[in-house]
Structures are given as structure tokens and as C-alpha cells.
Amino acid sequence: MSTSKELIIYTDGASRGNPGPGGYGVILQWGGRSKELSAGYRRTTNNRMELMAVIAALEALNREGLNITIYSDSQYVVKAVSEGWLRKWIMTGFAGGKKNKDLWMRYHQLAQKQKVKFVWVRGHADNPMNNRCDVLATTAADGRNLQVDEGFENNGEV
């Protein structure tokens, strides 16, 4: 990455059925450069893919202490972080059967190393980066050699 500590991330997740095959798409932008990421899974949910997009973006970083703005069309992800839902879920041990604990804990670990701010964007609207992430996510969901979403399939989460 460049010497700039500013990073912009666009994310999207998709599933063909809920549950069904799914995928995520990510665009990272820094210092006039960009990188795209995507992956597909054979059985998952849209919320898991929305969150997995954020995790994949953060896992791709090789520096800590970055100022990151993440643009997402997922109110589930944006509100969980911005409105304190995640903090409450962690404090209560995800009581009441809150879903996606495995992914939320991965996100939480990664976010501790960065300065992350979320911005909600309307999906399938006039944001070209969100639209590109949607193409990446749906193409990945429709692809071959889909990965196993271990936290979903192996834990019987629905």
C-alpha cells in the first residue's frame, strides 16, 4: 500500500436463495490505486456475504492504524457497527441466538487494528463502485469451484 493512511473500501454481498450459493465483491482504493476482491460460496446467506466482504477487505490489508471508510449497502452490517448492536451482542455473548457470531468475532478482531467508519449507500442505485461490487459478488456466486462457508454449513446455521 502507499504511504497514505487513508483507505476507501466498497463492499457488497449476494446470495442466490437465502440460504443458497453466494458471493462477495470488494473494491479497495488508496493513493490513486485500486484492487478488486471476490469469492463465491456454495451455501450461505446474503447477510453472511455482506459481512464476509468487509472481513475479506480488512484481511487483505498489510498495515494497521489505517483510517478506513467502508461503503456498504447492508443496513445489517452498517447498523450493527454504527449503532452499537455488535458491542451489545459481544457483551451478552450473542444471547438470544444472534446469527453470524463467527463472522462478527472475526470482524471485531480485525477492526481493532484500524480506524473504521461505515457509510450506508443505497444498493442498485447510482453508486458505480457499489454497482461494480454487486457484479463481482453475483459473478462469484454464479461461479464454479465455490468454497464452503464453514461457519454456516458446519454449524448448521440457518
Residue ranges with predicted function:
Residues S2-M52, L58-L66, V135, T139, ...:
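RNase H-like nuclease fold core
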Residues T11-P21, I55-R132, L136, A141, ...:
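RNase H catalytic domain
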